[in-house]
């Protein structure tokens, strides 16, 4: 998914990709509401491995649903 501000979040081959134009923080939460991980995001693209499942990724005031 792409946000008008240049933020992009997507999943591919068991990896979560987050591309952001500014430093930010991402919060990865399972659909059951459990916190999986917090990530500090530098400017540019961040890639992290993530187990199969469904997640809600919060970055800034946006949320994205990702399924692996």
Locate each region found by the language model.
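C-terminal outer-membrane/trafficking sorting elements
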Residues: 1-68
